[in-house]
């Protein structure tokens, strides 16, 4: 069905198409037509960060920034949904145009800039969501005008506001579209920031009587030495999990494309190799007690399998949905299922 809808959608500019897609999704969900338009996703129970997931394929942050489409998105078959990024105060983001579709390359360049209605609006929306078919992650960031020296105040404020409603919280330190944000991944800065957030997490756990996992979302553009340094900090601070990765400011395989010079983060198929290398290196340098989510460039089931092979416990997709539609979710689940079955069969044959 999506293959019939996509050509019409792609006649619109990318951001308008994004808005139309979400409105159409809501209409289909509330009218009861959504099951007729999507394939049933078979369960593949998975455990990570101490949470139970109906399947290991989730939606990455960025599609539903304000938590206004949670019910409809879960109905697409995702094992978990991550909403945001949200910030303490509302902000408009960067000037338009700020979202560019590279159709032939199955890629997107965005410089949205954390446009959102603020964490208080998101909290109200989450509280009003009726269906939770799997864990809900909430991705938090800092406001554009908050200096890095005060970034922990923004993150702690958001963490306190969302803690009671989130199944896990992602600390977004890696968007390339907020000036200076990625500097927070520098080893000493990262150690100080995560230390403060871990203290807040422990205080909130005691207050609410439950531990909400805290994940760190990393950039794909780090050098090997920077990845290793970050891994040391993440291990020392005993974070619950890591998401690898965010979008890239490099332009792999796109040098001749007319949009390659547009500022912003690149996602989609060209990011697959780079993000998977970072994932694999993090897996090598982190203990198995720290689960990883693989994201970046997943456009088919084989891509999801590659993330799992590189050490991911879960995967997320977003840009691939733009080009493949909701069927990508089930395709990824089945690819991961086949990989697990083949691995299990191989172990049995060697015993």
From Swiss-Prot:
In what way does this protein cross or attach to the membrane?
Peripheral membrane protein
Q: Which cofactor does it need?
A: FMN
Residues forming the catalytic site: 175
Q: In which pathway does it act?
A: Pyrimidine metabolism; UMP biosynthesis via de novo pathway; orotate from (S)-dihydroorotate (quinone route): step 1/1
Give a yes or no for keyword Nucleotide-binding in this entry. Answer: no
Q: Name one GO cellular component term.
A: cytoplasm
Partners and quaternary state?
A: Monomer.
Q: Which domain of life is it from?
A: Bacteria
What residue intervals traverse the membrane? none
| Keyword presence, Oxidoreductase | yes
What family does this chain come from, according to its entry? Answer: Belongs to the dihydroorotate dehydrogenase family. Type 2 subfamily.
Q: Give me the residues that bind FMN, please.
A: 61-65, 85, 139, 172, 217, 245, 268, 297, 318-319
- Keywords per UniProt: Cell membrane, Flavoprotein, FMN, Membrane, Oxidoreductase, Pyrimidine biosynthesis
Pfam families given for it? Answer: DHO_dh
Q: Which InterPro entries match?
A: Aldolase_TIM, DHO_dehydrogenase, Dihydroorotate_DH_1_2, Dihydroorotate_DH_2, Dihydroorotate_DH_cat, Dihydroorotate_DH_CS
Q: What class of enzyme is it?
A: oxidoreductase
Please write the reaction equations for the catalytic activity of this protein: (S)-dihydroorotate + a quinone = orotate + a quinol
- Record's subcellular location: Cell membrane
Q: Write the Enzyme Commission number(s) for this entry.
A: 1.3.5.2
**Protein name in the entry:** Dihydroorotate dehydrogenase (quinone)
State the function annotated in the UniProt record: Catalyzes the conversion of dihydroorotate to orotate with quinone as electron acceptor.
Whichever gene encodes this chain, its name is: pyrD
